[in-house]
Amino acid sequence: MTEHAHSVTGIDIHPGATIGKYFFIDHGTGIVIGETTIIGEHVKIYQGVTLGGLSTQGGQKLKGAKRHPTIGDNVTIYSGASILGGETIIEDNVVVGGNTFITNSVEKDTRVTAKKQELQYKNN
């Protein structure tokens, strides 16, 4: 059923995710919400948002582990944002700007935006 909904809407919400009242998705294409994600009430998210897990070292226990973020109440997450990791908590009344990449918790009543992008090259 989940795969059918994903193919029709472009939204991938794992059936194990916990979602509060008055959850709103605008322009849902590309949204991914992982299995252990917890979303509070009155949360709005836009296209291309990922609430996902961080990569793990080989052999780490994953079953039953909290791998995805917790989102508080009255949070807005704009397009292209990625919020990753089971220890990442976005507290209440936070606005997450577009194209941000978050792997640490964000305190309540905060606005998060991306700085001017710069290319970083890795020498092989």
Regions found by a protein language model. Give the residues of each.
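Terminal amphipathic alpha-helical/low-complexity segments used for targeting or macromolecular assembly
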Residues: 1-9, 124
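Extended hydrophobic/aromatic segments used for targeting, binding, or gating
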Residues: 55-66
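Left-handed beta-helix
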Residues: 9, 14-15, 20-21, 26-35, ...
